[in-house]
Amino acid sequence: LKGLPDHKIRIEATGHDSMREYEQYKFQLIREGEMPVPCILIIPSRANADSPVELRLQEEGKGTYLSEYANFAAALTEGKILLLADLRGLGETTDPAFYTDAKYWNREYRNAMISMHIGRPIMGQRVVDILTLLDFCSEHEFLKGHSVKVFANGIYGPAAIHAAYLDERINSVEITHSVKTWKEYIERPMQWNMYSNVLYGALKYYDLPDLIRLSNRSIR
C-alpha cells in the first residue's frame, strides 16, 4: 500500500432484483488505475434510517455466501443492510486453479508473487478495494449516513485491519479464521496462503496487533 487512492469512484449499476423480503442491487465500482470491485447490495424491507451497513468480505466469494439463505436470514429480520463484495483476486476474479501449483501452499501464488515483485503486495491492493467500498457507502443514496461494520474471514482479515486503522468510516470489524499477528508466520512457517498477506519488512515497524491497538474502534 503506497499512498491512498486519489481518484474518485464511478458507480455502475449492473442489475436489480426484487425479492419478497428485500431488494437486491448489483454494482461495479470503478476507480482509475485499479481493478473494478463487484458488489451486491441487499436492502431489507425492514431497513430504516438507523439500519447499519454490514460489509461482508468472504474468502469463499459473495456468491457462495448468498447461496445459503441461512447466512443472511437474521440480517433481513433485523433490518440490517448487507453489502457483499469480491476484492481483487477472489470471488469473481479468482485466478484459474491451473495457474497455481499446490506445492507453493497458496491458492493465489501467481497473483501474490507478481504483486510483491511489482512493489504492490496483494494485501495492500485489497485495502484500496475496501476504501473504494467505503467511498461507495459515503456516496450512494441508500447508504449515506449509515454506520459501517466490516465482517472479514480468511485471507481478508489483515486487509480489513489495515482499512480500519486508515479509515474512520469503519465503525467496527469482526474477523474470523484469519491471521491476527504476522509472528504466527515466523513461529509456524508451514501455513496455507501466507503469501497473500505478506508485507515484506513490515515487522521492523509494526505488527497487526499494533494497528488494532491504535485504531479507535472495536476490532476482534
Predicted regions and their residues:
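Short, solvent-exposed amphipathic alpha-helical segments in soluble enzyme
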Residues: 43-45, 70-74, 165-169
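Primarily recognizes the serine-hydrolase "nucleophile elbow" in alpha/beta-hydrolase
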Residues: 133-206, 210-214
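Cap/lid segment of the alpha/beta-hydrolase catalytic domain
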Residues: 48-140, 145, 180-193
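Non-catalytic accessory segments flanking enzyme active sites
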Residues: 1-43, 112
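Generic alpha-helical hydrophobic packing signal
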Residues: 24, 41-44, 81-83, 160-166
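Leucine-rich solenoid repeat scaffolds
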Residues: 215-220
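Generic beta-strand/beta-sheet core signal
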Residues: 30-32, 40-44, 56-58, 85, ...
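Generic recognition of stable, solvent-exposed alpha-helical segments in well-folded globular domains
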Residues: 24, 52, 67, 125-132, ...
